[in-house]
Amino acid sequence: MNKPITYAYIETTNHCNLACSFCNRDEVIGALQHMPLEKYREMLEGLKHHPIKEAKLMGMGEPMLHPHFDEICKIFKEYFPDAFLIVATNCQYPIKPGTRLGDRFQESMKYIDLLYFSIDGYKESYERDRSPAKWGRLMKFLEDFKHMNRYNCRVTCNYVVNPDNVQDIKTIQDEIVDIYNLEELRLNIAQNWSEDESMPGGYTQEDIKYLKDVWSQNIKGKDKWDYQDCFWVNEGIYTTVEGHVKMCCMNTGAEPFGNLFENSIDEIRLTEDYQNVKVGCNTNNPTSHCKNCSYKELAPMLTTIKNG
């Protein structure tokens, strides 16, 4: 018996203006496309009987590049008015007030509950890891954003930590989060999104001590986690712009279990392959699908940082 879906991760575009060093999008995406609004409604129609409480409208693309992203957010709230809606953006596009993209961005905030600004590193390290991002373009974005009506949308900085940008964290707190009145600095240890690869190391003992002593309260993720704790297999859904269903955002390189435009989500979740992955996690005996899960690989490091 499957539990109802309470968490949805929905990709509505796979267009992106960056090639981030930690992203595997080139390995996993198909033809570039934006999901048409009629297909999007069709997808939500097939999910509306599930009690979705939280959702992320993002994936392997930059969400705001969808030409109707404000409508995407509005329509989602029509189907799931009580769901908490999260979106992440790379801030590498113009949002000057009065422009088409600027108006789309501001209109979207009427429906988004939490907006992540993805900013990893400072100047040189930022441009290195988020190539071809430009620091100057980010600053122009933030200056234009500063004067916008946020409505009731909470806005935070989401920072992916790697061994080469640890020392930039304090600068981002001081010069971005504080100056532009962002809610918090969320720190996420870099994760690997491929099924057949493990996470690289590279952190020094000094790095770990610094993160523990200064930033442990900002670091997200569970320090005590095992496969049987995975919520994705029981209550989550990850869908691509084509409608393909995958188990989670931790393994975007996996083969899909089905397609929402061909079969219902309930039928897909009953397939043998889907059930094998689910049972494997629930019994703490994971299949090859989950063998390199970064949740599992991160747990010891998060334990050290959060608990010493």
Model-derived regions: residue spans:
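Proline-rich low-complexity regions
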Residues: P4-I5, P63, C153, P300
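A short local structural element in Rossmann-fold oxidoreductases
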Residues: S21-N24, E127
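Short, cysteine/histidine-rich loop/knuckle motifs that typically chelate Zn2+
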Residues: F22, W232, N292
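Short intrinsically disordered terminal tails
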Residues: M1, N307-G308
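N-terminal pre-triad scaffold of radical SAM enzymes
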Residues: M1-S21, I52-M58, N234-G243
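Kinked, hydrophobic transmembrane alpha-helices enriched for aromatic residues
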Residues: C23-D26, C249
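Conserved SAM/AdoMet-binding glycine-rich loop
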Residues: H15-L18, R25-V28, L37-G121
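Radical SAM enzyme [4Fe-4S]-AdoMet core and its adjacent flexible, acidic
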Residues: E11, G30-E38, D70, Y79, ...
